Amino acid sequence: MKADPRVHWFDVDVSDPEAVRARINDWTEERTRGRIRNLLSPRSIDQMTRLVSTSALHFQAEWRRPFRKEKTAPRPFTRADGTEIPASMMQSWMKARFARGEEGRMLELEYVNGYVFHALLPDAPSGLERLEAQLTPATLNRWTDSLESCEVDVWLPKFQREAEYDLASELSALGMARAFDPARADFSGIGRSSDGQPLYLSKAVHKTFIDVNELETEAAAATAMLTVTMAMPKARPRLEEFHADHPFLYMIRNGTNGTILFTGRMTGR
C-alpha cells in the first residue's frame, strides 16, 4: 500500500487529539475538493486512539445530454406518506436507455467520462422500500441487462444532499461484529499498540455529498474507521416516461464494468 501514490500514511502524536483530528479532516477536505468537511467530529479521537483509516472519493462529471435550465420548473414531489413538497424538476425529451419491470422502471443517463447515472423508480410513491428489499446483485443485473435505447420523457429533480452515518451496526450485521468487540477483535496482523494491548474498532464514520443539476453531477464520500486499545412534443416511436416525482434510488456506476461508486435514495426529506 505504501507504494501506491493514492495512499497517504503519516504518524501523529495522539497526546494532542484535536490536532490529529484537524489534520485528518484537512486531508479529507482536500481530497474531496471541499465537499466533505469535518469528517471526524470533536472528541472522536482521544489518547487511546492507535489507528485511523480514512478513505475519500470525489466524482464530478457533465451529462452527455445536459438538461436545459429554462425547462426546469417547480413541480410537486410526492413522498412515501402521500404528502407533497415542491421540487425543481429538470425536464427533457431525450434518447436514453430505459427498462420497465413489474413494480417500477429504470433509467440510465450517461456522463461524458464513461460513467452512468442509474435511477430506479417504483410505480407508486410508497413502493421504494419494497423495491429496495428485492434489490440484490442478481436483480440489479437483470434490470441493467433489460435496458434498451429509446425516446424518454424524463423528469428528474435537482437535488443536493449531505448525510452522515455511523456504519458500526451495518458492518456488524454484515459479519464484522467481532471487529468492534474489544474482547474478540483480532487485528494481530496489523499489530498491537505500543503498550501491548490488542486493537479493536471503536467506530466507522461515513459522510456523503451529492449535487445533481442540469449540467453535471458532483458527488463525494469519505469514511473513517478508528482503531483503539481496550482502554408535450409530436408523437415519437416507442416513447417512454420516467417521471421521478416520488421516491427513487440512484447510483453512479462505471459504464464499462458496472462498479458502483455512489448509491442513495431521493425521498424528499
Question: Residue ranges of each PLM-predicted region?
Answer:
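Extracytoplasmic and endomembrane cell-envelope/extracellular-matrix remodeling and assembly machinery
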Residues: 133-134
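Feature captures eukaryotic membrane-trafficking machinery centered on endolysosomal pathways
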Residues: 108, 236-269
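C-terminal, non-catalytic macromolecule-binding modules
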Residues: 137-140, 171
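Non-catalytic, conformational "gating/processing" segments within enzyme and secreted inhibitor domains
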Residues: 1-130, 145-234, 239
